[in-house]
Every structure is written in C-alpha cells, then in structure tokens.
C-alpha cells in the first residue's frame, strides 16, 4: 500500500525533501524523528483506549448499533527544529509553545 511504501522509505523521503529544501509533514509523531519537519495527527494511543472502553460497554450488554461513532478528540503537534533549520525555516515561538513535542 502507499502507506507501507511511505513508512518503509521515510528516511529517504525526508533526506530527498531536505536536499530540495522541502518540508515533510507526517500524520504521526513517531515519523518526525526520521527527518520530517513536523507531524499533526491524532494521539496514537487514544483510539486504543477508546476501543477498550467500547468493548467494555459491549461486554456489559450495550448494543454496538446503539453506540455512537467516535472521532479522535486529541491531536498532537510534533516539530523537528533540526529539519526546520536544514531547510531554512523559522518556527514562530507561539507555534513552538503549542507543540506537544519539539525535537531540537
């Protein structure tokens, strides 16, 4: 799949983007360490916790058809200042202050 292809080549993608002064933005924070500029996406652990709560409700008798569809509610912003410097980008202090994680 395209997702698997991108994941298996994330380092190469980040290196090529950096060489061409292009930012790489990922949907998951764990991918930023490979050289991406930033990530913004749902907290990776939250859906599993939410799923466990839903399973618990079902095991206690709730009907799945009666349960609402849930969407992510917590999103994480991770910024890689090394990558920003490599492509000549300055991240404003107010954006850094809102980040959940900063790679320096």
Language model segments and positions:
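Short hydrophobic alpha-helices and adjacent helix-cap/hinge residues
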Residues: 1-104
